[in-house]
Amino acid sequence: MIDFANFYQLIAKNRLSHWLHTLPAQLHAWQHDNLHGDLPRWNRALNKLPTTAPGHIELQRGVEIGNSQSLSEGERKKVESLLRQFMPWRKGPFTVHGIHIDTEWRSDWKWDRVLPHISPLAGRYVLDVGCGSGYHLWRMVGEGAKLAVGIDPSPLFLCQFEAIRHFTGGDQRAHLLPLGIQELPDLRAFDTVFSMGVLYHRKSPIEHIEQLRNQLKDDGELVLETLVVDGGVNEVLVPTDRYGKMRNVWFIPSSAALKLWVERCGFTDVRIVDENMTSTDEQRRTDWMINESLSDYLDPADPALTVEGHPAPKRAVLIARKAKD
């Protein structure tokens, strides 16, 4: 069973200490109430991962731990077999002792689009909402974050994160908690809050933006990445049923509408810093994620459209600053 005691001890000494009023009870409930049928199997795989000396750790140009010479061929095959127990791997990629985990998403490409526009992360307390397997948490640590906290309710993502952390030697600068943002109190403690690929899954996008604001300290920075459509300030796509075969897509605004939403929620210096069409090179089926991917969600006769006839995925990155309360 995954133990969160190290995180409790860590935040007891810093600006997040007030989180301890609610967090231990929430995570205790999660550990005892989570009924995902594969969780025992994933826990067994975590417990079987061998202890290795991490040696080389690269977190600035990617997430690369160890090298291909640090394990024997037999050990490497065992580690790869155990890591494959956590498929599908969606967010990455990772390289562990020469084993390349080729994830569905090239999350490093997204990071390369975001990084030039954000305030330096050195010494910052950072929250990543909907962090998936925690790939970007490690990149945040690579940029010098004092503490990178990710939240995502998926037990598989938590196990993937713990598998990677295991090979770092138990690095305590990054932590993933199996929670949704609606379960967080108003911490008002983070210097930077990221929400990437989450907003369009929320039934109330305004409420989500306000929840993000309530995690930031005054003058803190919001980094918001989401699907957008072309159009003016009043343009918002609400799919009648599915978008790219996903049922849980609710609101896809234009970049101008997104900017207005964020301004209305009490942010200043709001700006769109990047727009990018998602390509089938960035999101695709791999040997580590063998299910359907982006190419299956697009109209085969016109890849500018989804199979439902909506505009194909286009993503915008927005940066904003929290105005003082």
UniProtKB/Swiss-Prot annotation:
GO terms for molecular function: methyltransferase activity; transferase activity, transferring alkyl or aryl (other than methyl) groups. Carboxy-S-adenosyl-L-methionine binds at K91, W105, K110, G130, D152, P153, S154, M196, Y200, R315. It comes from the Bacteria. InterPro entries: CmoB, Mo5U34_MeTrfas-like, SAM-dependent_MTases_sf. Its EC number is 2.5.1.-. Transmembrane segments: none annotated. It catalyses: carboxy-S-adenosyl-L-methionine + 5-hydroxyuridine(34) in tRNA = 5-carboxymethoxyuridine(34) in tRNA + S-adenosyl-L-homocysteine + H(+). Disulfide bonds: none annotated. SUPFAM superfamilies: S-adenosyl-L-methionine-dependent methyltransferases. One of its GO terms (biological process) is tRNA wobble uridine modification. It is an enzyme of class 2 (transferase). The keyword NADP does not apply. Keywords: Transferase, tRNA processing. Homotetramer. Catalyzes carboxymethyl transfer from carboxy-S-adenosyl-L-methionine (Cx-SAM) to 5-hydroxyuridine (ho5U) to form 5-carboxymethoxyuridine (cmo5U) at position 34 in tRNAs. Belongs to the class I-like SAM-binding methyltransferase superfamily. CmoB family. This is tRNA U34 carboxymethyltransferase. It comes from Aeromonas salmonicida (strain A449). The lineage of its organism: Bacteria, Pseudomonadati, Pseudomonadota, Gammaproteobacteria, Aeromonadales. The gene is cmoB.
